[in-house]
Amino acid sequence: PAKEARRLAAADFKSAQVKQLNNQPWQTIKNTLTHNGHQYTSTQVPAAEMKIGAQDIFPKAYQGKGVCSWDTQNIHHATNLWMSTISVHEDGEDKTLFSGIRHGVLSPYHVEDPLLRQTGAESRAKEVLTAALFSKPELLTRALKGEAVSLKLVSVCLLTASNVLGQEGTMVKEQMRAWQSLTQPGKMIHLKIRNDDGELQTVKIKPEVAAFNVGVNELALKFGFGLKASDSYNIEALQQLLGNDLRPEARPGGWVGEWLARYPDNDESVNTLARQIKDIWQNKLHHKDGGEPYKLAQRLAMLANEIDVVPAWNCKSGKDRTGMMDSETKREAISFHQTHTLSSPGSLPDRSGQQIFQKVLLNSGNLEIQKQNTSGAGNKVIKNLSPEVLNLSYHKRIGDENTWQSVKGISTLIIS
């Protein structure tokens, strides 16, 4: 009885914590950073502030609040859902360099009933699609006028698809199942969106999702857990994105091929990213750290953005691996804007690249998002393991001990 009483007390305490974190104000985080005379703005917009009128766009309104990463039984809302953008101030206006949607895993994994868990995962997936539509204002306007619109999403899940030391393998399966159920060929789905009059309006979308899973932690990159399961999803998603011929030298097909046929003059960065991704795939470079743990994940998001497809990425909580992916992508977007050259897979940032990375890590809003979710800022990706060989390459990539410590923060004290 004493043991049971302790368990119930702990559950009550956790529930009160979740309520407090959810009910605090969830507001847009906007930070600027400068490099080589250019001013960049990193913006993180929470679901509660995705608005057309006075209220947020979601049918079950957030009302200025949020859903923290510890809310693992929520079957109505996606966890920790944000729109993330990096822009540059040039010629008197802000120009978006990269924009996407970030969130926690779709599975409400502490719901015990498997049917309810799957229903919850689909509800969360619909919220991600709603946020993705919101991130494309022209598409949203057409949808609100009654047009059935096509919405393409590249989903990059960052879990380790194995149930060794956790249940991430099951979570990946449930996330993939949610995407599959909403994207049957030719399927039209109806989303309810709160319009500028504050009324719920049904919009029709034809969603297409290229759903990847790319393990990025030590279990995946140092021990090889979940790689085979992940790649069974990735082959299908790659063919959707790049066509059936995945040889690096082959002309891209799929969504990329369609985009190149429409915009043949803007092909350089798209072709480079497509080739890099196929090269990573052919040589299984995403199975190892190799100086760049997020080499595949980050390029998939960049390529999606370049071809006007919405990139979405997530881990379990939407704050640590998701935050590092956010920072790596913004680092590359700024670096590309500065040098007009995309970095090659597995390359460490040069001195200027490290300075960009340091500024992004501290000013991208990720420390604030971690604090919003757990009351403590710090990224669990940053750690010192023994023996040294088990560590991912973040000391080398960041290149500054003070920044490394600031990004690590108090993450070791936070449970999940």
Curated annotation (Swiss-Prot):
EC numbers on record: 3.1.3.-
Keywords noted in UniProt: Hydrolase, Secreted, Virulence
InterPro entries xrefs: IpgD/SopB
Top-tier EC class: hydrolase
Gene Ontology cellular component annotations, sorted alphabetically: extracellular region
Origin superkingdom: Bacteria
Subcellular locations according to the entry: Secreted
Pfam families: IpgD
Active site feature: C315
Positions occupied by motif CX5R motif: 315-321
Principal location: secreted
Family from the record: Belongs to the phosphatase IpgD/SopB family.
Entry comment, domain topic: Contains the consensus sequence Cys-X(5)-Arg characteristic of Mg-independent phosphatases.
Function: Converts phosphatidylinositol 3,4,5-trisphosphate (PtdIns 3,4,5-P3) to PtdIns 3-P and prevents the transition of PtdIns 3-P to PtdIns 3,5-P2. It is one of the known effectors injected by Salmonella into the host cell and is required for invasion and for an efficient generation and maintenance of Salmonella-containing vacuole (SVC). Alteration of the phosphoinositide composition of the plasma membrane causes membrane ruffling and actin cytoskeleton rearrangements.
Entries under NCBIfam families matching the protein: PRK15378.1
Protein name: Inositol phosphate phosphatase SopB
